[in-house]
Amino acid sequence: TITRGTLPPCAECAKAKAKQKNVRKIGISPKAEKPGERVYLDVSKVTVRQKNGGEYNLPNKWWCIIVDEATGKKYALFTRTKRGITEPVCEWMHRMNSRGIKIRRVRMDPGGENISLKKRTESVDWQALQPVDFEYTSRDTPQHNHLAEVAFPYLAALGRAMLDTAYVPEKERGRLIVYAIQLAVQLDGLRIVEMNGVVATRDEHMYGEKPKWTKNMKRFGECGVVKEGKNGKA
């Protein structure tokens, strides 16, 4: 005869059905309404592959992205090492303070380089940056740092598109990709967005005016003539 019994839990079945816990779509903390109230920060490694499957040896291969939550304004810093972002980020925060934009909160993952950044901002050398609150995201939850996470593929794609449009030779792509990404970051500041009912560029929301270099914009990859001599100008 067959009788009904009790079966122990199947560990293999539980592992097969396991998935990451859903992350709430609406955050608990209110969104920043002013420039500098909260910025998102993350670090990634830049890799540029060659046609033969190898990779270019980039001198500054570590890319630190900073995104202002209120305006969406992006900033890119490139360093030789992952922990090398500490000083450049402090210098960036100092430059923002000098322009009247105080950085209040920094959201980032609890990586070693980010913990070093927090300690550096609390040092005597950068005491003027205080007070700054650091918000650490949970492990394996890139959704909590989404503005920085999404900015990486977005800006990298723009950089590759610029190189392709300019027909940059294969041997020069590794040298120019960082420069192209930096230009893409600057051009993203000209994107028109709405903030508190005001429609303007990200730069205008951030600084109150458009950058002066917009009057002298040239197409990426355009040939130019450099005159040398006493009165030579590029």
Q: What do these predicted regions represent?
A:
Residues 95, 158, 187:
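Solvent-exposed, charged/polar functional surfaces in cytosolic regulatory/catalytic domains
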Residues 152, 156, 182-185:
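Two-component system phosphotransfer/interaction surface
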Residues 101-102, 164, 197:
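Secondary-structure boundary/capping residues
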